[in-house]
Amino acid sequence: MSNSKKTKILLSEIDLFKCIKRISFEIIEKNLSVTDVILVGVETRGVFLAKRISETVRDITNKNILVGNLDPKLWRDDLENYHIKQAKNSIIPSDIKDKNVIIVDDVLYTGRTIRAAMQALLNFGRPKKIQLAVLVDRGHRELPIRPDYIGKNIPTEYEQKV
């Protein structure tokens, strides 16, 4: 009997582009002045996504959104399940006081990574507002976390990997 896992592509390149564009337009609509917005990508795929969203917003509005990165590993409540050698440096490109900070991640699942990211972010100051943007929301929340911007809802089974 084979233990091979089936792989299924959930988003094509075109789907990914559409999701990023939709999230970008929603950010522009919900934030009257995008100059007060800072995108903070969760290491590592969230950083890539935050950069793509920033580029798309710039293409639409001719305004730059600062992008930072955040490694929330040390703030996780399940550290015993991870073999963390060293956390990456978090870089927040500006003072976050009175800014709308949007945490960006690729997949939202239990909510634990986002909870840790919020805790890590608050070490840099107190933003005016924290919002959440995710490419994929797969459900199965263990914490009361809800994204403000979603590229695509993809219900999964608890055991599946995305």
Which stretches of residues belong to each language-model region?
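PRPP-associated nucleotide enzymes
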Residues: 1-162
